[in-house]
Amino acid sequence: MLSTLIKKLKIKPKQISLYKMSITHSSYANENKLKKKDNERLEFLGDAVINLLMADYLYTKKEKENEGFMSKKRAQSVCEDSLVIYAKSIQLQNYILLGKGEKNKNINNSILANAFEALFGAIYLDLGYYIAKKVFILIVIPRLSNIIDNIDFKTQLQELVQSQKKTISYYITEEKGLDHSKEFTAEVFLEKKNVGRGFGKTKKSAEQDAARYVLNILSKGEKND
């Protein structure tokens, strides 16, 4: 069973015991009296590895973005919900070793996300950063754009301006193109002052793009303060 998972990762392990440990939940280890053989320590390491891999990717591929904005993207891309998406793409839930009590339940998102982190901890320990990066590119990157695209910039901006007791408004100021290929322009007003604009194929996406732009500008201002 573990060999099938290894094939999906397209790697050649040196220490197979690390990969077995990465999918061993504490309930299974306790039940089978496997001292220090659960995946919790690997999870700790894997969390740091995945954060570094994501930071590396964003720094390299998103040259125009500032530190504050990249931090927001990284946080969204490595949160529990995102880790679960990556884990399910390789059916990791089918390989996790659980105690009898846990087997009677559905594997929850926390267990699945933790196992995914532990798996990257194992890859890093066994094969190093370069191979961990190759697996990251194989599993994470193809799904990353959808996750980043689904960041709700309008809500983030709304929460920010509300904390400053200000109001924000959006207006669609331009609509061009044919029905099947329209492009909309949205402008953002903070306390009646035009602070940015965005573009999109729908009104909603144009407003999200405008909010993204303003957040980027505001985060630059915070960094300079």
UniProtKB/Swiss-Prot annotation:
Its cofactor is Mg(2+). The keyword Magnesium applies. One of its GO terms (molecular function) is ribonuclease III activity. Residues 152-220 form the DRBM domain. Its main location: cytoplasm. One of its GO terms (biological process) is rRNA processing. Keywords: Cytoplasm, Endonuclease, Hydrolase, Magnesium, Metal-binding, mRNA processing, Nuclease, RNA-binding, rRNA processing, rRNA-binding, tRNA processing. It comes from the Bacteria. Residues 2-128 form the RNase III domain. Mg(2+) binds at E43, N114, E117. It is found in: Cytoplasm. The active site is at D47, E117. Pfam families: dsrm, Ribonucleas_3_3. The keyword Metal-binding applies. GO terms for cellular component: cytoplasm. Its EC number is 3.1.26.3. It catalyses: Endonucleolytic cleavage to 5'-phosphomonoester. Digests double-stranded RNA. Involved in the processing of primary rRNA transcript to yield the immediate precursors to the large and small rRNAs (23S and 16S). Processes some mRNAs, and tRNAs when they are encoded in the rRNA operon. Processes pre-crRNA and tracrRNA of type II CRISPR loci if present in the organism. HAMAP family: RNase_III. Homodimer. Belongs to the ribonuclease III family. This is Ribonuclease 3. It comes from Phytoplasma mali (strain AT). The gene is rnc.
